[in-house]
Swiss-Prot record:
An essential GTPase which binds GTP, GDP and possibly (p)ppGpp with moderate affinity, with high nucleotide exchange rates and a fairly low GTP hydrolysis rate. Plays a role in control of the cell cycle, stress response, ribosome biogenesis and in those bacteria that undergo differentiation, in morphogenesis control. Residues 160-333 form the OBG-type G domain. The lineage of its organism: Bacteria, Pseudomonadati, Pseudomonadota, Gammaproteobacteria, Oceanospirillales. Its EC number is 3.6.5.-. Residues 1-159 form the Obg domain. InterPro entries: G_OBG, GTP-bd, GTP-bd_Obg/CgtA, GTP1-OBG_CS, GTP1_OBG_dom, GTP1_OBG_dom_sf, OBG_GTPase, P-loop_NTPase. PROSITE patterns: G_OBG, GTP1_OBG, OBG. Keywords: Cytoplasm, GTP-binding, Hydrolase, Magnesium, Metal-binding, Nucleotide-binding. This is GTPase Obg. HAMAP family: GTPase_Obg. It is found in: Cytoplasm.
Amino acid sequence: MKFVDEATIYVEAGKGGNGCLSFRREKYVPKGGPDGGDGGDGGSVILEADESINTLIDYRYTRKFKAANGESGRGGNCTGASGADLVLKVPVGTTIIDTDIDEVLGDLVEVGQQIKVAQGGFHGLGNTRYKSSVNQAPRQTKPGQPGESRNIRLELKVLADVGLLGLPNAGKSTLIRGISSAKPKVADYPFTTLVPNLGVVRVQAHRSFVVADIPGLIEGAADGAGLGIRFLKHLVRTRLLLHVVDVSPLDESDPVESAVKIVAELEKFSPALAARDRWLVLNKTDLLAEDEKEAICADILKRLNWSGPSYEISALAGEGLQRLCQDIMTWIERRAEEERDDPEVAEADRLNREQMDQEVRERIQFLNEQRRLARKKAKESDDDDDDEDVEVFYAP
């Protein structure tokens, strides 16, 4: 199934049913009085997080959704039936944004979590409601109210504890294959990974974490180059970033320069995301000569001026993976405990996530607008070229 992580849809709640104008008609009851019932409420539109869905493809081609209207009231004080709510299932991790006012309506991060995006219209009132001592035969009713309508954008960000970051062919997919049951495609050409892949890493029976692998970044990614820019937003929800560096690249490029480029693109895309906890993972060390391995890795750390955690692994050979996974699990558990015990830490993390969301959203909107303008300019240029090629002949 095609992976779609963005969609724009129009939702409209149902209209409330109209109130009924009716009077009691019964033998030997010449003045039965009003008996018009109220209408039913219109159905609302609700979004619900469903763990069985992992893409927004259902909303890419069907753009309009409307809930049922409420039924009108009837005589005999019969109330009309309410319109059924329309429940739209979306993947866990979906953010809902009102595009008309550019406001985030909610974030569905738990299975079964719901958010009402369009309230159904209030029911109309029958003429019974207007009966009084001075108006015993009212002919007044009230129509049902229209339901709310919105243009909303759905943005899916995968839920993972750890995100893999690096250039194409750095070995990220091989790493996720080596530490989890996920089996992404692996090959020796760039951009083998086209969509995010998730894998569950089980350290022990009841200790596990989720890791996300996104397409590799290249220089200029923050300006729209390559595939990685489309999926960098999926790293927003992660707690920890693993920067995977190929210490023995096939093109003989400098690993340090490559690592610096990735960090620069990350900072340009979102400073808050770049400030996230990040560990350095030096991959493919099995390709280095045994007597040179330690010196080469130490030189990379020195030139990067790296002071954080670093690991030397071979994802293909499985070297160093167990220690890496154990340390990640311990860090995640310790971090979760700190957030649980210290409200200030939890609040700081929440604010940081909001800042990342805002920066990522603004950057993606800017790039989308740039692409739209570029397409418009290219189309206008093509039209001008076509006009210049036209020759007009006048027949006598």
